[in-house]
Design a protein with these regions (language model features):
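Active-site lining segments that contact anionic ligands and/or coordinate catalytic metals
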Residues: 35, 97-99, 118-120, 163-165
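Alpha-helix boundary recognition
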Residues: 3-4, 53, 93, 113-114, ...
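Conserved histidine-centered catalytic loops in small-molecule metabolism enzymes
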Residues: 140-171
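Active-site ligand-binding patch in enzyme domains
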Residues: 1-99, 107-110
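Short, solvent-exposed coil/turn elements at secondary-structure transition points
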Residues: 43, 63-65, 79, 127, ...
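Small/polar glycine-rich anion-binding or flexible loop at a beta-alpha turn
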Residues: 105-111, 128-129
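Flexible, gly/pro- and Lys/Arg-enriched active-site loops
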Residues: 115-152
């Protein structure tokens, strides 16, 4: 599975508050280590009852660090009200993390794309259109012109159930 191929799985606080994800590998035959669960939470709003607060988790904040359940909370430099993503990756690298799956949400994905920190993307697309009522998978990138948009090369594509899965590599 996708999660099992990474050292860490990252989400933003919006995903934690909306979905309370476990961020674990749930394959029946998986007996390897679980990826480190990483949350970007600049204002420390992660509930003590959240699944990510139960351990094997790192919560990055720009606020004064305080305990949240069994999760480790790390204070990093502020970048416009959010955790500095380079500082986050430096901490993860120092802990042996070499591969991070950014699983959600759109603001986190946009931040990593804006900072040119994405090597590869994998995503599923359903054959439905939601328009502006839907959730965006990538928030605003604040591009001055189309030429500034991050560019990717399609490496793989496959129909999975009724959805389309793609793997893209940064050019």
């Amino acid at each position: 599975g996708l999660r099992a191929r990474h050292d860490a799985i990252m989400v933003g606080i919006g995903t934690v508050l909306a979905d309370d994800p476990a961020l674990t590998v749930r394959l029946p035959d998986h007996n390897g280590p679980q990826p480190l669960r990483v949350v970007l939470d600049s204002r420390l709003r992660t509930p003590e009852t959240a699944q990510v607060a139960s351990g094997n988790s790192l919560i990055f904040t720009t606020a004064s660090a305080r305990p949240i359940g069994k999760a480790e909370v790390v204070e990093v430099v502020d970048a416009d009200g959010r955790a500095n993503l380079h500082a986050v990756l430096d901490v993860l690298y120092a802990r042996g993390v070499r591969s991070v799956l950014i699983e959600g949400g759109g603001e986190v994905a946009a931040g990593f794309l804006r900072e040119n920190l994405v090597d590869q993307m994998e995503w599923f697309r359903a054959p439905i259109l939601l328009g502006s009522e839907g959730r965006t998978c990538v928030a605003a990138l604040s591009l001055a012109k189309l030429a500034d948009a991050p560019k990717f090369r399609r490496k793989a594509i496959q129909v999975v159930g009724g959805d389309l899965w793609e793997r893209l590599e940064r050019i």
